[in-house]
């Protein structure tokens, strides 16, 4: 009986099998990633439209609810109508779209920040457009802005607790 021979070398199947598994897992993950990216794109694409009953203007939607509310409550009402909505930030083009939506006074998203001595939009956007009536703003206790119902449809400062119609806005992306 002699010394036993060494067994023949075993092929490196474990490494090969592991490599195949990693390659297959990577391919599956790549496919899943593509599906998820498509779902995200479709989801956001689906949100890039105005809800029924809202007026479309360029990249914005506008709506004047039937109820009247204080300026602050109006914020919440807009958000309940659509999570993307807030009181409207009005520029020159928007003014022409918004005016016919109500024949009554309506809050817009502009208020006076006394701490910074500046008028600010509810969405923190900046616009040089102002449509103040000649004598406005005229009262330091009136910190919120509305479009007046008169023939001029210009802006007036009013007490934020007063209840008026209001215009909500959604900015489409």
Curated annotation (Swiss-Prot):
Tissues expressing the protein: Coelemic fluid.
Boundaries of every C-type lectin domain copy: 51-170
Stored Gene3D superfamilies: Mannose-Binding Protein A, subunit A (3.10.100.10)
Glycosylated residue positions: 39
Gene Ontology MF terms in the entry: carbohydrate binding
CDD domains the UniProt entry points to: CLECT
InterPro entries, sorted: C-type_lectin-like, C-type_lectin-like/link_sf, C-type_lectin_CS, C-type_Lectin_Domain_Fam1, CTDL_fold
SMART domains registered for this protein in UniProt: CLECT
Keywords: Calcium, Disulfide bond, Glycoprotein, Lectin
Entry function: Sugar-binding protein which recognizes specific carbohydrate structures and agglutinates a variety of animal cells by binding to cell-surface glycoproteins and glycolipids. Calcium-dependent lectin. Invertebrate lectins may be involved in defense functions.
More details: This lectin binds galactose.
Assembly notes: Homohexamer; disulfide-linked.
Protein name: Lectin BRA-2
Source species of the chain: Megabalanus rosa (Acorn barnacle)
């Amino acid at each position: 009986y002699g010394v036993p021979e060494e067994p023949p070398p075993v092929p490196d199947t474990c490494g090969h099998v592991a490599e195949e598994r990693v390659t297959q897992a990577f391919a599956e993950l790549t496919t899943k990633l593509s599906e998820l990216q498509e779902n995200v794109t479709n989801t956001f694409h689906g949100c890039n439209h105005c809800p029924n009953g809202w007026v479309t203007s360029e990249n914005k939607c506008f709506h004047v609810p039937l109820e009247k509310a204080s300026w602050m409550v109006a914020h919440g009402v807009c958000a309940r109508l659509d999570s993307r909505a807030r009181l409207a930030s009005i520029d020159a083009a928007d003014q022409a779209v918004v005016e016919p939506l109500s024949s009554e006074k309506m809050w817009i998203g502009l208020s006076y920040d006394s701490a910074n001595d500046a008028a600010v939009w509810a969405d923190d956007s900046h616009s040089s457009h102002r449509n103040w009536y000649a004598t406005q703003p005229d009262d330091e206790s009136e910190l919120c802005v509305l479009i007046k119902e008169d023939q001029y449809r210009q802006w007036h400062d009013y007490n934020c607790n007063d209840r008026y119609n209001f215009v909500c806005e959604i900015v489409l992306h």
